Amino acid sequence: VVVTFEGALTAIRFRTVREAGPQLSPPAGAWRGLRGPWRSSLTQAAYEDGVEDIRERVAAGTVYQVNLCRILSHDLPEDLQVAALGRLLDERHPAPYAGTIHAPEVGVEIACASPESYLQRHGQHVISRPIKGTARTAAQMLPKDFAENVMIVDLVRNDIARVCRPGSVGVDALCRAEAHPGLVHLVSDVSGDLIQ
């Protein structure tokens, strides 16, 4: 499912899903990068106003955690090769949750490389592995990193509990250090069994 910023949904059901190996990797192409400036959905002043608004809401108790995000956008050339970008990401920034989707019939082309597994489902069992806390080494993690991870685990437990059998939700791992090229993340595992 792809959701635009405006809220439009595109759902794609694949007949088959195969893990990529050397034989399935996209062909090498010429990824030439993007030239010219990127656009941001927030100015610095708008971002700072958003931070102040969040602080007020946290102090008032109306929110627990907020991720203030902005959209970076760039005009794309007509001859853009998303598969080439996907291959470049795979070679230079290998990530456990990487992929390339080419579905031109519905206007979807995605190259992604993420260290985070938002949600997996195996039969009736679901697991989320949120990441909060990033440093160059595990020893450089700050108390703030552990506190943020515990906070997101609490939120994920609450969210999963809404659709899982009572008593089945648990934290299988808390604040596990997971190494990636050039950095370490704190990762926790939250799981439960879906209500049938």
Positions of predicted regions on the chain:
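Extended alpha-helical targeting/anchoring segments
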Residues: V1-Q196
